[in-house]
Design a protein with these regions (language model features):
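Glycine-rich, proline-tolerant flexible connector loops at the mouths of alpha/beta enzymes
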Residues: 36-57, 113-119
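N-terminal small/glycine-rich loop or linker at the start of catalytic domains
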Residues: 1-7, 68-80, 114-116
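Histidine-acidic metal/acid-base catalytic patches
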Residues: 2-7, 15-31, 90-91, 105, ...
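Catalytic-core regions built around general acid/base machinery
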Residues: 49-62, 130-139, 195-198, 224-228
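Active-site acidic/histidine proton-transfer and metal-coordination neighborhood
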Residues: 19-20, 61, 79-178
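Active-site-proximal loop/turn and secondary-structure-junction residues that shape catalytic pockets
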Residues: 12-14, 37-39, 73-76, 115-117, ...
């Protein structure tokens, strides 16, 4: 029996299908709902702390779900972590996200934000690393972790490989920082899961995803990942991440992932 649990991100279906998906999640043994905050609260999501608390209670009491992760945490935000003036404003916004996550008892926030981490010629890694150190300190204060996700060159030009994300988190050694292990990045970059066995202890959340967030395909890497996570005693969530699709595709995906990972 695996120590980890299963989740799916709510970016994968239309809002009107929420309850149908929640029912299918229960039937497939999923216990986590990963959320994009603006999917729940379209405007200024982090100002809705009371509503977040109520939403978390509804998920737990009505459906038995927790919120293991938040993604798209900077949706609609401009600015760049390599620019100190932008970084200060983005850090303030991230602190609001941490407080929101804390209200939901959500332990991990995915840092993808590819557009906000484009490195211009002459930009120093030190600026980005200073941002992450400050963000990690804030995350720890709220009892959450910022999970840094590698994104392929089709999205950004900083932290493209999974190895780079692990290297950064290990180097900064901040209790508020972790890695979001994203299978679509591994696939796009041609990386091998077995190369990261010793690094899995730095992972706070896992995405089962395809390049371009296409619907999940059946792959041998899924079983390999399930075995690796079981072997190292990973206790977080394995979460399906895909772009919005139809209800039947979501249901088929839930059943497939449950079959492979449970």
């Amino acid at each position: 029996m695996a120590n980890y649990q299963l989740a799916i991100s709510n970016i994968a279906w239309h809002k009107e299908d929420d309850e149908a998906v929640y029912t299918a999640m229960q039937q497939a043994g999923f216990t986590g709902l990963e959320i994009a905050p603006t999917r729940i609260f379209p405007e200024m999501p982090y100002e809705n702390l009371t509503s977040a608390l109520l939403f978390g209670g509804y998920l737990k009491n009505q459906w038995g779900f927790s919120v293991p992760s938040m993604q798209s945490i900077w949706y609609g935000q401009t600015g760049n972590i390599f620019n100190p003036a932008d970084a200060e404003r983005l850090l303030d916004y991230t602190a609001e996200a941490f407080q929101f996550a804390h209200s939901l008892n959500c332990p991990s926030l995915v840092f993808g934000c590819p557009k906000n981490r484009m490195r211009a010629l002459g930009d120093s890694d030190a600026a980005a690393e200073a941002f992450f150190m400050q963000a990690g300190n804030l995350a720890a204060r709220y009892g959450v972790r910022l999970a840094i996700e590698a994104n392929p060159p089709m999205y950004t030009n900083y932290l493209n490989g999974t190895a780079e994300a692990f290297s950064l988190v290990k180097r900064l050694d901040n209790p508020g920082l972790a890695v979001n292990l994203d299978l679509s990045t591994l696939l796009a970059q041609g990386e091998k899961l077995q190369n990261f066995v010793d690094d899995l202890k730095y992972v706070s959340h896992v995405h089962i995803s395809e390049p371009g967030l296409a619907p999940i395909q059946k792959r041998p890497e899924h079983k390999e990942l399930a075995l690796l996570l079981g072997a190292v005693g990973y206790r977080g969530f394995v979460s399906v991440e895909m772009a919005r699709t139809d209800l039947d595709t979501v249901k088929r995906t839930l059943d497939y992932v449950a079959e492979v990972f449970q």
